[in-house]
Amino acid sequence: MGKYFGTDGVRGEANLELTPELAFKLGRFGGYVLSQHETEAPKVFVGRDTRISGEMLESALVAGLLSVGIHVYKLGVLATPAVAYLVETEGASAGVMISASHNPALDNGIKFFGGDGFKLDDEKEAEIEALLDAEEDTLPRPSAEGLGILVDYPEGLRKYEGYLVSTGTPLDGMKVALDTANGAASTSARQIFADLGAQLTVIGETPDGLNINLNVGSTHPEALQEVVKESGSAIGLAFDGDSDRLIAVDENGDIVDGDKIMYIIGKYLSEKGQLAQNTIVTTVMSNLGFHKALNREGINKAVTAVGDRYVVEEMRKSGYNLGGEQSGHVILMDYNTTGDGQLSAVQLTKIMKETGKSLSELAAEVTIYPQKLVNIRVENVMKEKAMEVPAIKAIIEKMEEEMAGNGRILVRPSGTEPLLRVMAEAPTTEEVNYYVDTITDVVRAEIGID
């Protein structure tokens, strides 16, 4: 990670950390770096989610892009993966999404996609950071016909919706409950599943700029669990603020997380001979039960650090076509270059329809070990240093020795928030609580948190 860029672009509290001034510079410098080798006038797509700060940051970012001669196509409110899809399929120089994904409304973020539809690599981010830190802005300042042109492009959303529908199968009145998190999916999910022929119940579809992810969406699926049971839906589908994640709910109201979604899709593709190298790419956060289920089915796995960018890097490097995270990022490389909650949802309902199995039947093949995750809020400067504190390292080693291989512990700094994450898995809930509570007590004592 760099000074400005984390694992998923530039993020911070809007108007305090992620200011309009910084957004302008990111537009100006990012646009320049991503378009300097273009032979024709560069074109950049810009999308945003529903946060109240989105239009403020969009205006500043767009001004920066226009100031270096880039033509900007404003997409409005739509999913992050829609930006990636449109960049790749419409020959744009780059794309930019203004969103902080699953974070609360006070935060926002800016992430870039290259002309290939993939998130930027470390080298490109370093180039942008060097310009941000330069003492003087020496980039060209064209005038008159040299300036960029601003175009509203609502057709982009319709094209994305049509594409996702084309990857699915008719649902013939299947009862589907949607939770669009008062976020980006609120402009598209209803239309996509209506076009597929689903009978819909929708919540989290009334964004007001402040309620994105607020007690709804993939990080708060409790409301959807109740709606699924009350409406008699066959499946519930919860997206996060920018719709790059999916958490599902089965017909009984039980959660089907990213691990189970990856398993269901992976097994389906494997049986059809369509799972590249018969391998799923996952992260260190995936549950032991997921790994055991893959072993039973003879499906291989490749394991990366936490963060969908690392999953994508491994997929591109080795030619895999399915990967993701327990949190609900699922990358289906045959269809898109990044995690796409609505695409995953379309594929999941297609598998249910084609196999004739309920979601609970499909998900029951993975037995999830009890897992507990505690987030300890720390300053960003401390979250990396905490991992080197001798007492913290010692208690982690001690707990791992006690597990004797029947479980696991993971302590890591968040790549996107000022948090230290402590996670444990074990055969029983009592053991999990013991391991996590013991470690968090030591962490809090060592870094001075009561």
UniProtKB/Swiss-Prot annotation:
Catalysed transformations (reactions): alpha-D-glucosamine 1-phosphate = D-glucosamine 6-phosphate
Protein name per UniProt: Phosphoglucosamine mutase
Matches recorded under Gene3D superfamilies: Alpha-D-Glucose-1,6-Bisphosphate, subunit A, domain 3 (3.40.120.10), Alpha-D-phosphohexomutase, C-terminal domain (3.30.310.50)
This protein's UniProt keywords: Isomerase, Magnesium, Metal-binding, Phosphoprotein
Species of the source: Streptococcus pneumoniae serotype 4 (strain ATCC BAA-334 / TIGR4)
GO biological-process terms attached to the record: carbohydrate metabolic process; peptidoglycan biosynthetic process; UDP-N-acetylglucosamine biosynthetic process
Function statement: Catalyzes the conversion of glucosamine-6-phosphate to glucosamine-1-phosphate.
NCBIfam families named among the record's database cross-references: glmM
GO terms, molecular function: magnesium ion binding; phosphoglucosamine mutase activity; phosphomannomutase activity
Similarity annotation: Belongs to the phosphohexose mutase family.
Active site: 101
SUPFAM superfamilies with a match to the protein in the record: Phosphoglucomutase, C-terminal domain, Phosphoglucomutase, first 3 domains
